[in-house]
Amino acid sequence: MVTGYRMTEDEFVLLACFYELAAIPAWIVREPEELDLERVLGKLERRGLVQKMDGQDVPHLVIDFLFSEMAHSPCTAGGTDRIFCWFGAHAALALERNVTALSLMPFQTPQELFAYLRETGYERENLAFAQLDPAQDDAAAQLKETWEAGFEQG
């Protein structure tokens, strides 16, 4: 069973801006300027995803880890209207779009993520592989091989 962190699109957009994510799903259409920051921060605080410390809003350690992984991820895979994946140095993450919310799911290895994608049928949607940083050619090539091998093992 995958443990996920449910959040609204507004909450995700606010955190994505804070962590300066280079890649987000195309189906996220909210612009940061459209957000009611006080309302969104209030919801994040009530849910324990952001905490007040010395008058500052500080993300929970788990949220900090997950969004830092996404921000420093050299490669992503995405391309459907329901799921988007990041492959970081210490975790693989999937953002799944549900009817009312987004679920951010961390996996310890890419293989665990591939298994989840197979179980839920996402691999049949032909997730497109995208390379963010051309300077990361070796890492991107290795990730693409791992990605393809992960689906072949199923």
Q: For the regions a protein language model found, what residue spans apply to each?
A:
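Long, highly charged amphipathic alpha-helices
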Residues: 39, 112-115
